[in-house]
Amino acid sequence: MAGFKVPSWITYKSFWIAVSSSVTTACVILGTLEFRKHRSIRRLQSMIVPEAGKSIQLSSSGVPIEIYDAGEEDEGISKGVPYDENLIREQLARNYAFFGEDGMERLRNSFVIVVGCGGVGSWVINMLARSGVQKIRIVDFDQVSLSSLNRHSIATLQDVGTPKTLAIKKAIKKFAPWIEVDARNALFNPDSADDLLSGNPDFVIDAIDNIQTKVDLLSYCYNHKLPVIASTGSACKSDPTRVNIADISATSEDPLSRATRRRLRLLGIMEGIPVVFSTEKPDPRKASLLPLSEEEFEKGDVDELSALPEFRARILPVIGPMPGIFGLTIATYVLTSIAKYPMDPISTMTRPRLYEEAVKRLHAEARKAGVNLDKTFNASEMSYIIEEVYVGRSALPPHESQKVTVVRWNPQLPFDHTNLVAMTRNEARYHEDNVLAKNVDPSTVYGKDVIEVVHSFLRRLRMWEMLY
């Protein structure tokens, strides 16, 4: 410190005290900053799923399976852990107050299978577990995506990229550890049905959004007499006042439900499956199926964009609460059914005799016209044409709904279902006498307005044939 002179008012001792205090303060500040830095690094590292000890394998169906450290119980059956019965009853106190001892005994001895663990299925599973269902098997091949967090009831950011079944199973352990969860990271198909639906379940819940997989599941349950309830599409829906439960034969205004009904009817299944659906009609002002960009089409095969072959590649817009409403509705239906809680659901009816009469009329008309049919019509097809295409009413104004049948529209066109029109019996007799018997074009008998209405129905039928 040459040339530096300490002021006379500062003593030698006080000078070094000041220097040491400054050094100490600097060390404390730097140490604190370094500590905060390391703490932030550790926090960020804890948010990242560790890769060590984890590998990717494919199941027999080509679905990725996450394999974690052997010390973690992530896949398969979680037997549940010993848990004090008094604590269980306290946690389920409101359910005991609602269902009573007998109802809760049924629920706590029940076994439910949920196929599909996405927006709808996750809400179903969540409430079944919170309501005391003792054993739940959950089936899904897919993984949690970031975009699915807007509607999934359980998954978190840390679950993104992991199997949906694993995310749900781990979550249930945190609030109901006594429940047995059988997590199956698998794709449901006819080959896996016997295994995935084994164990004599009290209920099977269909929360699938793929048409053919849904049909495979529902037809299996129907043929094996397994109690089942299905969810139709909650995407593009926004009106909660229009959500209903009805027999599948009475549902409407939903493309997924319509396509499912049609395929089930071709398998001879016309009714007997309850579904949750929305009566909300499509509206050009509302959300609809998003088209693929021209860029994706230019790249080549757009089917490669889907998760699996025959699964949709285009995006269905969905507002988060709607899958929850569907799922909670299903959960309530299943819980009250298993507990045998008094319910008075609105009944829906089909008209099997009417369908059979329509079949007989068509075959009689073919014989009378000397037409050799390539195939015989059946009641399932008549049900589809009358109830789906013509909404249970005559195609001719004023569109009456009583005593509806089906007739060939234009005798100069092929005798197939794309040339069939719903009419009342009186209208059908008039049509047979003035159009079919004279072998003339319907436009020579009916006015322009009637022709346009009928053709709009026929266009709808042909469009649905192409789509579904």
UniProtKB/Swiss-Prot annotation:
Summary of the function given for this chain in its UniProt record: Catalyzes the ATP-dependent dehydration of threonylcarbamoyladenosine at position 37 (t(6)A37) to form cyclic t(6)A37 (ct(6)A37) in tRNAs that read codons beginning with adenine.
CC terms in the record's Gene Ontology section: membrane; mitochondrial outer membrane
Family per similarity comment: Belongs to the HesA/MoeB/ThiF family.
A Pfam family that the UniProt record links to this protein: ThiF
Domain of life: Eukaryota
Membrane-crossing residue ranges in chain numbering: 15-35, 109-129, 315-335
Source organism: Schizosaccharomyces pombe (strain 972 / ATCC 24843) (Fission yeast)
Gene3D superfamilies cross-referenced by the UniProt entry: NAD(P)-binding Rossmann-like Domain
The protein's Enzyme Commission number: 6.1.-.-
Topological type in the membrane: Multi-pass membrane protein
InterPro entries per the UniProt record, alphabetical: ThiF/MoeB/HesA, ThiF_NAD_FAD-bd, Ubiquitin-activating_enz
Keyword Acetylation: no
Subcellular location(s) of the protein: Mitochondrion outer membrane
Gene responsible for this protein: tcd1
Gene Ontology molecular function terms on file: ATP binding; ATP hydrolysis activity; tRNA threonylcarbamoyladenosine dehydratase; ubiquitin-like modifier activating enzyme activity
Major localisation: mitochondrion
Name used for this protein in its record: tRNA threonylcarbamoyladenosine dehydratase
This protein's UniProt keywords: ATP-binding, Ligase, Membrane, Mitochondrion, Mitochondrion outer membrane, Nucleotide-binding, Transmembrane, Transmembrane helix
One BP annotation, GO: cyclic threonylcarbamoyladenosine biosynthetic process
